[in-house]
């Protein structure tokens, strides 16, 4: 039986919750109430972005594969350097790249400098995935 979108979402959240590279109370999860941005240090925001689907086979019945991106936005205060963000990005990539669970397959990822504003510098860690 094909993995549903909800099962995929939960598998990704479970994987993020097993990540030990940053305290869990510093990660903002989708639809989780009550997150407060820390006054100091690193913090992250997890977003699961679904992509297009495609038919990968039509044996007895069509097999549709779903695509998407696991996006982890990583933030640190300005003027604290970028080493901590770089190490966190490396750790997140190592944690997610080529991970699989049931019909979820995480592919390669990247860490991209996303800029800064008046308070934070931001890196985006993005890992592509396929389901089914």
Feature annotation, model-predicted:
Residues 1-60, 80-91, 99, 117:
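Small/polar-rich, solvent-exposed N-terminal microdomains that initiate assembly or binding
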Residues 18, 90-132:
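Acidic-leaning, charged glycine-interspersed low-complexity segments
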Residues 48-51, 61-68, 72, 103, ...:
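Alpha-helical context
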Residues 50-53, 66-70, 92-97, 128-129:
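Short, surface-exposed linear patches
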Residues 62-78, 121-132:
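Oligomerization/assembly interface segments of phage tail-like spikes and tubes
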Residues 75-82, 101-106:
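Short C-terminal domain-edge/linker segments immediately following a structured domain
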């Amino acid at each position: 039986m094909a993995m549903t979108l909800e099962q995929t979402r939960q598998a990704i959240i479970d994987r993020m919750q097993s990540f030990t590279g940053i305290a869990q109370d510093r990660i903002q999860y989708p639809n989780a109430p009550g997150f407060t941005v820390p006054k100091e240090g690193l913090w992250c925001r997890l977003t699961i972005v679904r992509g297009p689907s495609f038919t990968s086979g039509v044996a007895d019945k069509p097999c549709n594969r779903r695509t998407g991106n696991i996006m982890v936005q990583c933030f640190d205060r300005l003027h604290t350097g970028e080493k901590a963000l770089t190490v966190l990005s490396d750790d997140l990539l190592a944690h997610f790249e080529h991970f699989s669970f049931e019909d979820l397959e995480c592919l390669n990822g990247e860490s991209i400098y996303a800029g800064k504003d008046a308070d934070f510098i931001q890196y985006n860690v993005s890992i592509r995935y396929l389901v089914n």
